[in-house]
């Protein structure tokens, strides 16, 4: 649901070191700034550790409790044993929306071959869209720039917008 014609956005930074206060979160504030153009209003921001059950719980709070339109996670999308954000997200979503993650990887591959190791997924739970973003601010910016133009339409569709998807 939109408040004041703004999409409700929740941001979850997944980082063991950020959670312990050993590293400042730069990606969460960057996301906050970038979603203003949706237009988006950040209604929830939290740093949580790379613990699958805690990520699942946080995602459910954002979708089922807070009824956020968009949940953006940052961090935990790689191959390290502690990178479990996509695994937790997969357990929470009802449908995957692969076009977003494919677009992010395709654009990132133009800059680095390391984009191939991203396991980030995007999906929906109820009427919420959950997007996994990488952890580094540079990658967050690059990935968000790719998907931001499509987010308002996708979020409106999730809310039941009956207009046609085709554009002339």
PLM regions and their residue ranges:
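Non-catalytic beta/alpha edge segments that cap or flank active sites
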Residues: 1-168
């Amino acid at each position: 649901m939109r408040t004041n014609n703004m999409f409700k956005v929740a941001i979850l930074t997944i980082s063991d070191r950020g959670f312990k206060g050993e590293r400042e979160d730069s990606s969460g504030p960057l996301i906050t700034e970038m979603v203003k153009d949706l237009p988006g209003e950040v209604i929830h921001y939290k740093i949580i550790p790379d613990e699958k059950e805690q990520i699942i719980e946080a995602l459910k709070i954002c979708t089922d409790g807070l009824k956020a339109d968009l949940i953006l996670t940052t961090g935990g999308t790689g191959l390290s044993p502690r990178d479990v954000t996509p695994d937790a997200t997969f357990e929470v979503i009802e449908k995957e929306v692969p076009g977003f993650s494919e677009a992010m990887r395709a654009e990132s591959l133009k800059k680095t071959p390391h984009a191939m190791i991203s396991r980030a997924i995007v999906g929906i739970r109820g009427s919420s869209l959950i997007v996994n973003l990488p952890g580094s601010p540079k990658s967050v910016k690059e990935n968000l720039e790719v998907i931001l133009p499509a987010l308002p339409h996708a979020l409106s569709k999730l809310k039941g917008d009956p207009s046609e998807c085709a554009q002339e």
